[in-house]
Amino acid sequence: MSSINGLVSEPFLAVYSASKGAVVMLTRGIALDYAKTGIRCNAICPGWVDTPINYAHAELLGGLQKVYEGISVFQPIGRPGEPREIAHLVLFLASDEASFITGSIISADGGMSAM
C-alpha cells in the first residue's frame, strides 16, 4: 500500500512522500523480479480516506470539518474515500480476475492525481 503522496507532493509531507515513493519503485522491481513465477505485485495509492490516521493530519490542517468542507479542492469527487472502497480494490487485485495486472500503480484518490 502506497499513497497518492508517493506520486504527488504536499507541503510538510516530504519524508512520508519519499517513503511512499519508495513503495512505488519497490512494487515495480518486485513485479519484474517475480512475474515469470506467477507472483504479481501492485501498489494502491489512496487519496484522502476517512480513517483514524487521517484525523491527526486533519488537526494539523485546521480540523476534520474544515478539511471535509474543502476536500473538493484537492479531491475532485468531492468527498473522502471510504475504507471499503480501498478494500474492494485490494480484493480485486488479489483475485484471478486481475491475473494480467502486475507492476501497476493504481490511484484510488477521487481524481486527485488527475489535477
Per-region residue spans from a language model:
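Residue(s) in the substrate-gating loop at a strand-loop-helix junction
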Residues: 3
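Conserved catalytic-site region of short-chain dehydrogenase/reductase
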Residues: 6-8, 114
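Catalytic tyrosine of NAD(P)H-dependent dehydrogenase/reductases that use a Tyr as the general acid/base
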Residues: 16, 24
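Active-site helix of classical SDR
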Residues: 19, 27
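Alpha-helical segment proximal to the catalytic Tyr-Lys
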Residues: 32-36, 99
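Hydrophobic structural elements of the Rossmann-like NAD(P)H-binding subdomain
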Residues: 41-44, 54, 103, 108
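C-terminal helical subdomain
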Residues: 43, 65-97, 101, 110
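A glycine/serine/threonine-rich, flexible loop-to-helix segment
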Residues: 48-74
